């Protein structure tokens, strides 16, 4: 039956077939690969995989601690199939997303680096050229002047003195050559440790950094292999950097005294001049504290086009003289909390806090080289 259905493909215009497939989630397309050889060849074609990623890019939230994934639109909670290797090396200290690939740092004695595609369930371990430290900063992207699929990793050595020009301060790993190289690049900023996971947008890495008394956005371009200061940014106790609409940066802010939330947005990152402007704020009294204590995990979030926020964060409650950590998924708009879903709870002393509560990624068919 599968083969007879496959023979019907030529009866439809090829362009129409592709347009239909572009609207199907990556998780479902994987099952289509076994239908017949024609489907397999199409779905595994490089051109198709990247077109699908650019046409259909719904976000997912993932928590490796609970092994849970939530679709922020349907609010369906499902199991995340965490590789066995990650379970042995848990906890994952941080993750950075690029084209459906997650660059993961593991907080164990060897501080391993790995690249993981949650949809394809592929994982690749990256052996550092020197010992990886938890104070190092990592990012993932690509040289868009050469080939999008030749992904690269930047490792900025956090403990090297910035005024010592004799020592390299960063390294680049290239997937296709499976090798590291030293890069001597000028770097005059201090990356904020609370936001050190950074954001990869269209192959370039962005971080919140501090220079003297000012907070700013810095960018690393994998094409030119240079750092650049992009724009100043607002900053408060809870400051989380994210991507909006595929080509802009977002900031989620919440102060220490006030529970009010501010959302800031840049214009397109391809513009000559980039700056932040306030998108909207929320001042209703029912807002949760997105980051209760410095020792607890930072929230993971995304911003919707209807001036709404989806955020997965930790809370704390006391019941009968016992303290519990409550994991809750919220949807918030300008009028306050619209929905909240409790997804997990733990005894305070049984819970080993991850550095970030959750991560946002886009499912993709892109294989790991």
From Swiss-Prot:
List the SUPFAM superfamilies: F-box domain, Galactose oxidase, central domain
What InterPro entries has UniProt attached to this entry?
F-box-assoc_dom_typ1, F-box-assoc_interact_dom, F-box-like_dom_sf, F-box_dom, Gal_Oxase/kelch_b-propeller, SCF_F-box_component
Matching entries from SMART domains are given as:
FBOX
Gene3D superfamilies on file: 1.20.1280.50
The organism sits in which domain of life?
Eukaryota
Give every F-box domain span. 6-53
Q: Which PANTHER family match?
A: BNACNNG10540D PROTEIN, F-BOX PROTEIN CPR30-LIKE
**What is the designated name of this protein?**
F-box protein At3g08750
| The organism of origin for this protein | Arabidopsis thaliana (Mouse-ear cress)
